[in-house]
Amino acid sequence: MRVVDVQRYWVANVDISNPDEYKKYATANAVPFRKYGAKFLTRGGKSEMVEGKLRSRVVVLEFPSFEAALACYRSPEYAAAKKLREGASVADIAVLEGYDGQQP
């Protein structure tokens, strides 16, 4: 029997309208991200949209469990950080479970 640890992710698509205020959010979100075991996989680096639409910044965080990912988003610490983001950007955020099925 194969035991696999399927990871869980936040995928955030963000358009930043106020970079200085967004930096305050990026500083504030470190507290809940650390508390819930988040690890940045992408954080607004180089990208090229090859099909469809995305916002200008894509952030992917990995969490140790789906429950941890949701708990982080719903935490009072993240709620405080989110208030800083809301005035500085528009974001679409999804919590996703990794895939452990058959691969090509």
Could you describe each region identified by the protein language model?
Residues 1-57, 64-74, 97-104:
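Short S/T/G/P-rich N-terminal loop/turn motif that feeds into the first structured element of a domain
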